[in-house]
């Protein structure tokens, strides 16, 4: 009987030890964001109840960035990496801290605001008075946006610039291949941010080249 009680006590002690060990293990999931917005360049999406406009200068032209559309294989919180020409891996413990389309729009808006410094830049969705003041809208359809740690990141996207009345002013396709500086997921995400910055620069260049009489035609 005493031996039986001793065995039970040992088992209970082991169970308690495993329980404490399990409680001590932290969640291994890591969360990432794309790029890092310059202070004051783009307003937080948390203020969705108010017009989310950002004044990048003293100009009167308003640029709207969005919507951004991502393919279904990327429309998830997990980061997706390329493992072959036709294969990908969905990472369980490496996730986006925000919806991917929101992160893409944020970085693009940041680049446009920085490179078209006399314009107002707003992020989709916009409402009320802000919606009525937009002269240029950038719509982006992402075709591919993935990479491999220690290798390259590929961003392939079609994008359009629309006038405030819906007329198409430009239609382009951009493919950006960005090298990943070293192994690991954080460097890969950083490379994804740089690829988006390159796309944002292309969009800003196109906007700056648009004839300013577009505003007068509104």
Region annotations inferred by a language model:
Residues 25-48, 115-165:
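Surface-exposed short loop/turn segments
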Residues 19-22:
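C-terminal motif of bacterial Sec signal peptides marking the signal peptidase cleavage site
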Residues 59-129:
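N-terminal segment of the mature soluble domain
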Residues 62-69, 80-82, 137-141, 154-160, ...:
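Soluble periplasmic/extracytoplasmic beta-strand elements of cell-envelope proteins
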Residues 24-48, 116, 182-218:
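C-terminal/domain-edge helix-coil "capping" segments
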Residues 9, 39-58:
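Intrinsically disordered, low-complexity terminal tails and inter-domain linkers enriched
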Residues 88-97, 165-205:
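Short secondary-structure boundary motifs at beta->alpha junctions and helix caps
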Residues 2-12:
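Bacterial N-terminal signal peptides that target proteins for export
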């Amino acid at each position: 009987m005493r031996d039986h009680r001793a065995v039970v006590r040992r088992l209970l002690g082991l169970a308690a030890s495993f329980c404490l060990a399990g409680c001590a293990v932290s969640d291994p999931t890591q969360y990432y964001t794309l790029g890092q917005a310059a202070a004051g360049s783009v307003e937080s999406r948390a203020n969705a109840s108010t017009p989310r406009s950002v004044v990048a200068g003293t100009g009167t032209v308003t640029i709207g960035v969005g919507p951004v559309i991502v393919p279904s294989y990327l429309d998830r919180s997990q980061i997706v990496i390329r493992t072959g020409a036709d294969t990908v891996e969905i990472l369980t413990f490496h996730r986006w801290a925000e919806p991917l389309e929101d992160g893409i729009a944020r970085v693009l808006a940041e680049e446009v605001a920085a490179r078209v410094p006399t314009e107002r830049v707003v992020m989709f969705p916009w409402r009320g008075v802000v919606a009525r003041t937009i002269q240029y809208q950038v719509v982006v359809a992402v075709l591919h946006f993935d990479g491999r740690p220690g290798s390259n990141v590929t961003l392939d996207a079609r994008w359009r610039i629309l006038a405030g009345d819906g007329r198409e002013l430009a239609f382009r396709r951009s493919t950006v291949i960005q090298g990943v500086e070293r192994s690991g997921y954080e460097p890969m995400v950083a490379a994804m941010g740089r690829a988006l910055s390159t796309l944002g620069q292309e969009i800003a260049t196109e906007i700056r080249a648009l004839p300013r009489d577009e505003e007068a035609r509104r």
